[in-house]
Amino acid sequence: MKITELTAVTLGKKIKAKEITVAEAVSAVLEQIEAVEGDVHAYVTLKDKEKVLKKAEEIQAKIDAGELDGPLAGVPVAVKDNMCTEGVLTTCSSKILSNFKPTYTAEAVKNLEKAGAVIIGKTNMDEFAMGSTTETSAYGVTRNPWNLEHVPGGSSGGSCAAVAAGECLFALGSDTGGSIRQPSSFCGVTGLKPTYGTVSRYGLIAYGSSLDQIGPVAKDVTDCATILEAIASYDKKDSTSVKREDYDFTSALVDDVKGMRIGIPRDYFGEGLDPEVKEAILAAAKVLEEKGAIVEEFDLSLVEYAIPAYYVIACAEASSNLARFDGVKYGYRAKDYEGLHNMYKKTRSEGFGAEVKRRIILGSFVLSSGYYDAYYLKALRTKALIKKAFDKAFDKYDVILGPAAPNTAPKIGDSLSDPLKMYLGDIYTISVNLAGLPGMSVPCGRDAKGLPIGLQLIGDCFKEKNIIRAAYAYEQTRKYEAPKLAKTAEGEAK
């Protein structure tokens, strides 16, 4: 098996056992990037090769000296381009931040560096994380490694495509309305969105502050649980960070779901769900039932109100958060302007893409004095009711099971021509963010075109262990599949 086909934890073990050096692991990933990046375009910025190899040597020395012995030491990782990395371009895939090099590093990324992971580069995304296809990036479209004519999903499409294509061993993404789970589903990888407040948002360039959460993207459940243990921490620099009682997630990696109560919302299986996706999800539920889980259908109310509530809240928060990008202190500044007001106007008009402008305008509208009560406050009340509906469901169930997306990856260009259809595609993921819950997408088959399908598992707040346990048990019945594109002759594992 090639180095780039190993899981992150397996590679970490081989490095520790001196079967593979950190430099060999990094070189294998760099060779893979050279081979496939021209087709996939998963990265916006790749770190300087010499610097990365030098870092690999430093980490190797620390491993040899016994200073680093964690499971991710020496493992190459990619970081979504909305997380600050000191001295390394952080663009949010937007023209307005085309020259922005932060003076500090995001807390989650710092935690990975402390764990000894080697950062290879920054991955492409929908501009400011606004989109579900990674087509709104100012730096080109990322393609799905399973079929280059299809999108990888979004907004963490670059991270998920990079993992699927073997261009890193794991990646960090962010999830505001499904931006880890949906592209993980489309790219056939595993993605975990933790409970809101579990991973520090310090250094994450904000889209919807009450919804954003950083999480791992990897080849399997073991990797995701291990990475989450490394990045989760209480951080007083983030006012929404939560001091959890328990930061252990890997103890849930047991193949035992006997007696686990799993609920399937009938509302998730109505009109608009692709029949092949439905079949794969119900087959996955059957597998868990055969392993001893108690699986039953139930009614989860208010699902149909999640999308309007989400877009009102997220866009309102975005219009406020993105007000700081005005060309004054950092980022892009328009040329040939007349006066300060004109500079603001030209900078923002030229710097932001169409989708970002659409959401800023929508957000400004719902926050305006005549409409604040009618839209924004109503959306907040709906959000509270959705959380209540989930609370009621979790009184009875340990895990909620359903699809991560209503379909497999659409063709490039299909979604941008119909933004409303793209928004509706988030139907199964959005309510998880509104309620602040943990959610996970695990590969559960492919459709007739060979495109991956993702199973979504949802847990109660701070109950990541339940979804990890269910996902791990299900995963034992399947083998990880990599797309053909992700296989090259170089970088054989010993």
Regions found by a protein language model. Name each.
Residues 1-55, 65, 290-292, 365, ...:
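An N-terminal boundary/leader segment
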Residues 72-214, 265-267, 316, 402-420:
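Short glycine/serine-rich loop/turn segments
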Residues 25-29, 309-310, 356-364:
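Short alpha-helical scaffolding segments that buttress acidic/His motifs in well-ordered protein cores
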Residues 35, 114, 165-170, 174-272, ...:
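Structural helix-boundary/capping segments
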Residues 12-13, 302-303, 326-434, 484-491:
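Serine-dependent amide/ester hydrolase catalytic core
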Residues 29, 52, 105, 224, ...:
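Residue-level signal for inorganic ion chemistry
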Residues 72-92, 254-263, 316-387, 438-454:
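Short helix-loop capping/hinge segments that flank enzyme active sites or metal/cofactor-binding pockets
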